[in-house]
From Swiss-Prot:
UniProt xrefs under InterPro entries: Aldolase_TIM (IPR013785), OMPdecase (IPR014732), OMPdecase_AS (IPR018089), OMPdeCOase_dom (IPR001754), RibuloseP-bd_barrel (IPR011060)
Pathway(s): Pyrimidine metabolism; UMP biosynthesis via de novo pathway; UMP from orotate: step 2/2
EC numbers, comma separated: 4.1.1.23
UniProt record similarity statement: Belongs to the OMP decarboxylase family.
Binding residues annotated for substrate, in chain numbering: 37, 59-61, 91-100, 217, 235
Enzyme class: lyase
Any one GO biological process: 'de novo' UMP biosynthetic process
One term under GO cellular component: cytosol
Reaction catalyzed: orotidine 5'-phosphate + H(+) = UMP + CO2
Protein name: Orotidine 5'-phosphate decarboxylase
SMART domains in the record: OMPdecase
UniProt cross-references to Pfam families, sorted A to Z: OMPdecase (PF00215)
């Protein structure tokens, strides 16, 4: 059973956040994560209202927002997440020592741990980063929180490959309940050791091949067939001249079709 269904995985997953996310994916029939990098709260909330019915996960970079506030941004964002049944992933990419990331996660302007179901981290500083972030989650949130490790990136010339990727996977193994997956371009293994990593893949496009700043796009079928569970799509949903509702529906359908193909191939 190389590729179990989302429902099967949800029922036995070690991570409460992963189980919740997998259940949402199964019930909404979507493996689409919308990445909405805009500069105002009004733009963000408007886009979320359009794509919300079609996504399982919203990926944010709140430090891009010129007008971020807990009351004006986070509160309505959480309300939309409840309305449309999706989780929130703040793409913070923590990359410091344990004590520092603990404070970055819990404190400051953004207080990420209070509202983001999921965040992520680089493995460059070692396993202390996982410990620091988990402590912040335990001390500052009554809701379950989960961490993704950045194993691979979609940008041209990325150094996240080879020994770095292998080392990052080893760091992820230090906490099975808190670390539940990776940002990666393919499956990261681990099933023979009892790990069920969720793989989220950026750089997915149905139309575009790349941009002038080094982004490289792969097709939905390609990333799902090689082990990705969630496709992360940004400008493909709301870029110039695009209808966010229509595009999110199109990517949702493409992602779900690719998932069904993977399940069928595994059962044959």
């Amino acid at each position: 059973m190389a590729f179990a269904t989302y429902e099967e995985r949800a029922s036995v997953h070690a991570s409460p956040v992963a189980s919740k996310l997998l259940r949402i994916m199964a019930s909404k029939k979507t493996n689409l994560c919308a990445s909405l990098d805009v500069r105002t709260t009004a733009e963000l909330l408007s886009l979320v209202d359009q794509v919300g019915p079609y996504i399982c996960l919203l990926k944010t970079h709140v430090d891009i927002l010129d007008d971020f506030s807990m009351e004006g941004t986070v509160k309505p964002l959480k309300e939309l997440a409840a309305k449309y049944n999706f989780l929130i992933f703040e793409d913070r990419k923590f990359a410091d020592i344990g004590n520092t990331v603990k404070l970055q996660y819990s404190s400051g302007v953004y207080k990420i741990v209070q509202w983001a179901d999921i965040t992520n981290a680089h493995g460059v500083t070692g396993s202390g980063i996982v410990k620091g972030l988990k402590e912040a989650a335990q001390e500052n949130s009554d809701e379950p929180r989960g961490l993704l490790m950045l194993a691979e990136l979609s940008s041209k010339g990325s150094l996240a490959h080879g020994e770095y990727t292998t080392g990052t996977v080893e760091i992820a193994k230090t906490d099975k309940q808190f670390v539940f997956g990776f940002i990666a371009q393919r499956g990261m293994g681990g099933r023979d050791e009892g790990f069920d990593w969720l793989i989220m893949t950026p750089g997915v496009g149905l139309d575009d091949k790349g941009d002038a700043l080094g982004q490289q796009y792969r097709t939905v079928d390609d990333v799902v067939s090689t082990g990705s569970d969630i496709i992360i799509v940004g400008r493909g949903l709301f870029g110039k001249g695009r209808d966010p509702t229509a595009e999110s529906r199109r990517y949702r359908d493409a992602g779900w079709d690719a998932y069904l193909k993977r399940c069928n191939a595994a059962s044959n």
